[in-house]
Amino acid sequence: MKNNLPTQHTYTNIIFDLFDVLVLHSPLPSNILGKDKALEPTLMNFFKTEAYANYKKGVINLQQLTELLPKELPVSLFQTVLKQIPLNVQPIPEMIKLLELLKSRGYRLYLLTNVAPHTMPVLEQRFSFLQLFDGILTSFDARALKPDLKIFQLLLEQFGLKSTDCFFIDDLEKNILAAQQLGIDGTTYTSYEALYNELKSRFLL
């Protein structure tokens, strides 16, 4: 989606979402579930629960999360899957090149992501492109998940940003709408090509 703010505007900060914008999740390898393949729906549903959301917010730790598992879901299987998830994440090559281009143009780059505490350290070890960011704020550090306005407010405060100097890119429209409530302009990511054209039209490239 696009907002109705004037087309030509000077932005100095570009804020990126991580998942489904810069990186993608690959399916779990078939050998991970093995004989427990039938439990996959239960496992996937657990990742959508309030308990897992609280884990991503840093409200509960991994041990507390494990204690909330459905009885039919073995702890060992859950732990194996948790370790595998960050290894299944792969960057979108053209988006990483775009990051590098924006950095070379002098923009300050920020990352705002809903992510589990165990995942981010692995991604930081795997992906050097994360070093391009001038600041990173995770949901577990903010104790809030997008689209909660709290996480956007904290980003602005923590890095001393002025909302009208920022342009936000996220794959979920609800997150863009939340950011706009604080005066942060943005666009919903659908593809590299669409984003590139949008940035060109906004005079960001």
Please provide the spans of the model-predicted regions.
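Active-site neighborhood of HAD-like aspartate-dependent phosphohydrolases
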Residues: 2-49, 53, 57, 181-182
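Asp-based, Mg2+/Mn2+-dependent phosphohydrolase catalytic module
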Residues: 2-11, 116-117, 124-205
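Short beta-strand segments
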Residues: 15-17, 110-114
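Acidic donor-diphosphate engagement hotspot in glycosyltransferases and nucleotidyltransferases
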Residues: 25-27, 94, 115
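Hydrophobic alpha-helical core bundles mediating ligand binding, dimerization, or RNAP-core interactions
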Residues: 33, 65-69, 81-85, 116-123
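A metal-dependent, Asp-based hydrolase signature
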Residues: 52-81
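Short, acidic loop-to-helix structural element flanking the phosphoryl-transfer center
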Residues: 63, 82-110, 149
